[in-house]
Amino acid sequence: MGNIRTSFVKRLAKELIETHKGVFTTDFDQNKKLVMEYSTVSTKHLRNKIAGYVTRLVRLEQTQE
């Protein structure tokens, strides 16, 4: 069983994907840098949670296509 993400993490991740279509990939390390660039997240812990959720959403999107 995995961890449950807060609604803030989910909302911000979805907003980033919507506003920057095609930029995020399935690579977590690259997504970390992009989250730092496109958002105002102040802590490393929160940045990593958002980048991880973005990576998961991108992977799910690719498998559905």
UniProtKB/Swiss-Prot annotation:
PROSITE patterns assigned to the protein according to its UniProt record, in alphabetical order: RIBOSOMAL_S17E
Pfam families recorded: Ribosomal_S17e
Record has Ribonucleoprotein as a keyword: yes
GO molecular function, one term: structural constituent of ribosome
GO cellular component assignments: cytosol; ribonucleoprotein complex; ribosome
InterPro entries for the chain: Ribosomal_eS17, Ribosomal_eS17_CS, Ribosomal_eS17_sf
Ribosomal protein among keywords: yes
Organism domain of life: Archaea
An example Gene Ontology biological process: translation
UniProt KW keywords: Ribonucleoprotein, Ribosomal protein
Protein family (similarity comment): Belongs to the eukaryotic ribosomal protein eS17 family.
Protein name, UniProt field: Small ribosomal subunit protein eS17
Organism: Methanobrevibacter smithii (strain ATCC 35061 / DSM 861 / OCM 144 / PS)
